[in-house]
C-alpha cells in the first residue's frame, strides 16, 4: 500500500480588528496526490489562492510554516486554533519488584529491552552530540545517559503562535530544563552505580528498559517566563515523525487542564496523534496530569491512550526535629547540611504585648520584623499545595538571617532542597504540636538533624496529592486513569540548567515521572508479546496491577482528606510488570472498536471520518458506550437495569477454565453469564454478559467493586464503578 501523507499547513491568518492577531491553523488535506514536493507545495498554494483571493496572499500565509505529516491517514479538511500543553513533572524499580534477580523475569526475557525503541515526545535529552560536549565539560556525572537512535525538534507551532521571543531555550534538539532528559532516563536509562541526590536516595539508577533505545522528539520549549509549553501542532508533528520512524512505544508527559477538547479535535494534538500511532500498533503512554486531588481533573482521556496516575513509593526522607521538652517530631526534607543545635524556635504571632504585627503564614514571612526571625528556627503554616511555597519561605527566612524554617502543610506534596538551607515539611497535626510547645514555654528551642533515607517498612504507598483524578470529564463511562506508578521524588538524570541539578541528577515529582515508568514496562511487554495490540498490553497491566502496595497494605490517596484509593485515583492499581507479562486473559480492541466508541458518544460522521481517515457512517441506533471492550466497567448514570458485554482472549494455557468472582459495589447487584469460560485450541475468544441493577432510590456518588476471572493461577481483575442517577444529568449540590 502506498503510504499516505497528511499535509498540515500551518497558516498565518491575520485578523484585522484594531490590531493584527496571528493565529495558527492545522489544515488536514487528506491523502497526498503528488510525490513531487514542488507539486505538493503548488497544490497548497492553489487551494489557499482560491480561499484568500490572491496568489500573493496565499504564498504569504503559508511560507515558511508548512509541515508535511507522514502517517497513514486520510483526513477531511478541518482547522483549529493552536492549543498549548503543559509538561506533567533509584528506588522505583526495586519497589515495583522490577529487577533482574530471577532468571526468568521480564527483564531477562527481553535482554532488558535491547533493540526496542521508546519514542519520547518532550523537551528532548542531554545526548547525541550535545551530550558528548557536555560530558567533556561536566565529567562523568552525566553517565545516566540513554542510548539514542535519533533526536529531532519541532517548533513551528510555538514560533508561529508565540514568536521567537528572547529566552534561554536551545533552538535545537538539546534539552534546556531537564524535563525530557529526566523522562528518557526514567524509561530507559543505563545502570549508574552510587547515584544520589544531595547524598540521599543512594543506589544504582536505571530505567525500566535499561538497554532500550530512545528516539527523542522535542516539541516542548522553555519560555522566558520559566514555564515550559508544547504546541498542539508540534506535538502532532512529533508523533507523526515517531510513527514514520517505527518506534515501539510512545511516552508523552504533557497534557492540559479541564475543560478538555473532544478526542476528534485537532486542538487535542495528543489524542489525534495517539490514535494514528495506536492504529499502527504503537502503544501510547501519557501522563494523567497534575491537577489533583480534585475529581474530574484527569487529562489524556481518549480510550486508546494508556493514562498514568502517580503514587509515592516505599522511600521517605525523615528529618528529626527535637524540641526543648525532649519530644522528637519527624518531618520530611532534603537537607544535608550540618546539625542545627538547640536554637530559639518561633512562631510569628501577635501576643498583645507589642504594637508590631507578626505573620505566621508562610507566604507572609517576609513581612515580619527582622528581629523576630533573626537567628531563629521559624514555624509557619500554609494552605498552598505548591512546593515553591517552601522555597519562598526558606528564601524569606534566609533574607532575615534565620537559621531554618518548618512548614506545616497538607501532606503529599513535593519536597524541595531549598539550596542547602534547612526547610522541613510537617503536616498540620505535627505543626500544631510544635506550636503548642512554643506557646507552653517562655524559651522554646529546637534542634534539627540532617535528613536520612528510609526505605521499606513502615513507609506506605499513597496516590500523590497532585495526581489528577477521575472520573473522566469527556466520557464518564471510560475509566481514567488506567494505571498508576511511582511519580514522587523520582531520581533520574537532568540538565545542568535544572534548578535542582546535583551532579547530573535531580529528584522530580509529577505524572510526567510516572508515565515513563509505565512506558518502559510497556516496551518490555511488547518485546515479550510482539503481536499483542496496544489494547491487549493496556489490559494486561490493568488486570494484573497491585490494589494493595507490594507489602500487602492498602493504598491510600493523599488529598485534603486522606482516604482509601479507588479506581478514579489509580485505575487498575499500581503497575506490576511480572504479572502483566502473563495475565491469562486480555480485553482486546482495535480501530473498529474505537470507531464504535466515537459513534456511541455522539461525534458526527464527518468528524470521525476526519480522525480515522476512512469514511464513517455511524449506525442508528448508536452502539452503547458501556460495551466498549475495556478492562473496566464504569456506569455513570445507572437508573434501570443494564446488561454489558465484554470479550476476553485467552493468552494463557490452551485448556484454561475460568470462573468469576464478583465484589459488587455497595447497593448494586452484579451477575455474570455464563458462569464458566472454557477455552480450548479452537476457542481463544469468549464473550460474557454483566447484568447490573441498583437498589438505591436516590442519586448517589460512585461505589466501587471488581469482577475477577480466575483459573486458580491467574486472577484477571477489572474495576467496577457505578453511580446511581435516578435524575439524569443532575448536578448534585445540596
Curated annotation (Swiss-Prot):
Family, per entry: Belongs to the peptidase S8 family.
Listed InterPro entries: Peptidase_S8/S53_dom, Peptidase_S8/S53_dom_sf, Peptidase_S8_Ser-AS, Peptidase_S8_subtilisin-rel, Peptidases_S8_3, S8pro/Inhibitor_I9_sf, SBT, Subtilisin-like_FN3
Q: What is this protein called?
A: Subtilisin-like protease SBT3.2
Q: Name one GO cellular component term.
A: extracellular region
Gene Ontology molecular function, alphabetical: serine-type endopeptidase activity
Q: Which UniProt keywords apply?
A: Autocatalytic cleavage, Glycoprotein, Hydrolase, Protease, Secreted, Serine protease, Signal, Zymogen
Q: Where in the cell is the protein located?
A: Secreted
Gene3D superfamilies per UniProt: 2.60.40.2310, 3.50.30.30, Peptidase S8 propeptide/proteinase inhibitor I9, Peptidase S8/S53 domain
Q: What is its EC number?
A: 3.4.21.-
Originating organism: Arabidopsis thaliana (Mouse-ear cress)
Q: What is its main location?
A: secreted
Residues of the active site: 122, 179, 512
Show where the PA domain sits.
361-438
Give the signal peptide as a residue range, or say none if absent: 1-19
Per UniProt, the enzyme's principal EC class comes to hydrolase
Q: Does the keyword Cell membrane apply?
A: no
Q: Which residues are glycosylated?
A: 108, 143, 326, 355, 497, 669
Amino acid at each position: 500500500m502506498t503510504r499516505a501523507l497528511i499535509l498540515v499547513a500551518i497558516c498565518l491568518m491575520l485578523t484585522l480588528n484594531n490590531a493584527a492577531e496571528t493565529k495558527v491553523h492545522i489544515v488536514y488535506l487528506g491523502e497526498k496526490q503528488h510525490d513531487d514536493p514542488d507539486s505538493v507545495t503548488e497544490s497548497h498554494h492553489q487551494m489557499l489562492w482560491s480561499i484568500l483571493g490572491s496568489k500573493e496572499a496565499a504564498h504569504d500565509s503559508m511560507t515558511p510554516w508548512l509541515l508535511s505529516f507522514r502517517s497513514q491517514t486520510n483526513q477531511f479538511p478541518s482547522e483549529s486554533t493552536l492549543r498549548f500543553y503543559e509538561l506533567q513533572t533509584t528506588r522505583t524499580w526495586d519497589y515495583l519488584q522490577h529487577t533482574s534477580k530471577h532468571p526468568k523475569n521480564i527483564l531477562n526475557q527481553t535482554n532488558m529491552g535491547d533493540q526496542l525503541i521508546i519514542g519520547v515526545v518532550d523537551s528532548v535529552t542531554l545526548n547525541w552530540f550535545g551530550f558528548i560536549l557536555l560530558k567533556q565539560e561536566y565529567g562523568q556525572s552525566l553517565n545516566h545517559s540513554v542510548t539514542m537512535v535519533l533526536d529531532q525538534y519541532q517548533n513551528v507551532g510555538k514560533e508561529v503562535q508565540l514568536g521567537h521571543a528572547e529566552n534561554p531555550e536551545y533552538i535545537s534538539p538539546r534539552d534546556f530544563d531537564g524535563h525530557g532528559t529526566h523522562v528518557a532516563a526514567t524509561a530507559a536509562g543505563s545502570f549508574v552505580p552510587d547515584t544520589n541526590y544531595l547524598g540521599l536516595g543512594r543506589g544504582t539508577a536505571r530505567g525500566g528498559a535499561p538497554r532500550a533505545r530512545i528516539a527523542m522528539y522535542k516539541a516542548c520549549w522553555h519560555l522566558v517566563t520559566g514555564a515550559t509549553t508544547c504546541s498542539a501542532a508540534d506535538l502532532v508533528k512529533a508523533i507523526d515523525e515517531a510513527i514514520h520512524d517505527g518506534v515501539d512505544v510512545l511516552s508523552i508527559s504533557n497534557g492540559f487542564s479541564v475543560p478538555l477538547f473532544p478526542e476528534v479535535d485537532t486542538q487535542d494534538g495528543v489524542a489525534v496523534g495517539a490514535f494514528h500511532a495506536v492504529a499502527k500498533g504503537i502503544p501510547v503512554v501519557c501522563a494523567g496530569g497534575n491537577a489533583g486531588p480534585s475529581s474530574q481533573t484527569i487529562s489524556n482521556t481518549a480510550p486508546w491512550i494508556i493514562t498514568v496516575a502517580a503514587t509515592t513509593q516505599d522511600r521517605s526522607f525523615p528529618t528529626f526535629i527535637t524540641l526543648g521538652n525532649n519530644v522528637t517530631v519527624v518531618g520530611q526534607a532534603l537537607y544535608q547540611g550540618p546539625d542545627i543545635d538547640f536554637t530559639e524556635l518561633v512562631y510569628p504571632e501577635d501576643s498583645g504585648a507589642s504594637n508590631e504585627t507578626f505573620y505566621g503564614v508562610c507566604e507572609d514571612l517576609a513581612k515580619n520584623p527582622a528581629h523576630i526571625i533573626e537567628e531563629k528556627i521559624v514555624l509557619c503554616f500554609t494552605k498552598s499545595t505548591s512546593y515553591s511555597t517552601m522555597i519562598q519561605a526558606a528564601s524569606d527566612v534566609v533574607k532575615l538571617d534565620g537559621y531554618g524554617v518548618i512548614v506545616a502543610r497538607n501532606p503529599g506534596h513535593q519536597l524541595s532542597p531549598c539550596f542547602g538551607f534547612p526547610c522541613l515539611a510537617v503536616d498540620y497535626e505535627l505543626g500544631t504540636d510544635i506550636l503548642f510547645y512554643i506557646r507552653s514555654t517562655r524559651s522554646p528551642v529546637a534542634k534539627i538533624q540532617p535528613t536520612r533515607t528510609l526505605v521499606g517498612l513502615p513507609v506506605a504507598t499513597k496516590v500523590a496529592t497532585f495526581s489528577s483524578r477521575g472520573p473522566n470529564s469527556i466520557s464518564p463511562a471510560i475509566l481514567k486513569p488506567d494505571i498508576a506508578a511511582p511519580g514522587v521524588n523520582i531520581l533520574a538524570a537532568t540538565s545542568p540548567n535544572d534548578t535542582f541539578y546535583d551532579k547530573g541528577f535531580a529528584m522530580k515529582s509529577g505524572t510526567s515521572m510516572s508515565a515513563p515508568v509505565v512506558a518502559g514496562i510497556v516496551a518490555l511487554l511488547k518485546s515479550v508479546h510482539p503481536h499483542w495490540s496496544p489494547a491487549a498490553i493496556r489490559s494486561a497491566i490493568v488486570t494484573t496491577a497491585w490494589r494493595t502496595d507490594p507489602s500487602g497494605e492498602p493504598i491510600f490517596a493523599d488529598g485534603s482528606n486522606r482516604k482509601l484509593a479507588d479506581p478514579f485515583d489509580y485505575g487498575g492499581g499500581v503497575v506490576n510488570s511480572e504479572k502483566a507479562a502473563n495475565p491469562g486473559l486480555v480485553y482486546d480492541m482495535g480501530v473498529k472498536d474505537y470507531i464504535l466508541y466515537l459513534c456511541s458518544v455522539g461525534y458526527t460522521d464527518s468528524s470521525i471520518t476526519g480522525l480515522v481517515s476512512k469514511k464513517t457512517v455511524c449506525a442508528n441506533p448508536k452502539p452503547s458506550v458501556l460495551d466498549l471492550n475495556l478492562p473496566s466497567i464504569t456506569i455513570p448514570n445507572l437508573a434501570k437495569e443494564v446488561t454489558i458485554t465484554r470479550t476476553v482472549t485467552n493468552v494463557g494455557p490452551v485448556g484454561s477454565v475460568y470462573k468469576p468472582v464478583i465484589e459488587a459495589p455497595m447497593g448494586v447487584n452484579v451477575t455474570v453469564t455464563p458462569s464458566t469460560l472454557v477455552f480450548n485450541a479452537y476457542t481463544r475468544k469468549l464473550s460474557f454478559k454483566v447484568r447490573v441493577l441498583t437498589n438505591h432510590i436516590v442519586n448517589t456518588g460512585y461505589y466501587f467493586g471488581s469482577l475477577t476471572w480466575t483459573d486458580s493461577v491467574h486472577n484477571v481483575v477489572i474495576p467496577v464503578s457505578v453511580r446511581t442517577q435516578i435524575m439524569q444529568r443532575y448536578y448534585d449540590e445540596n
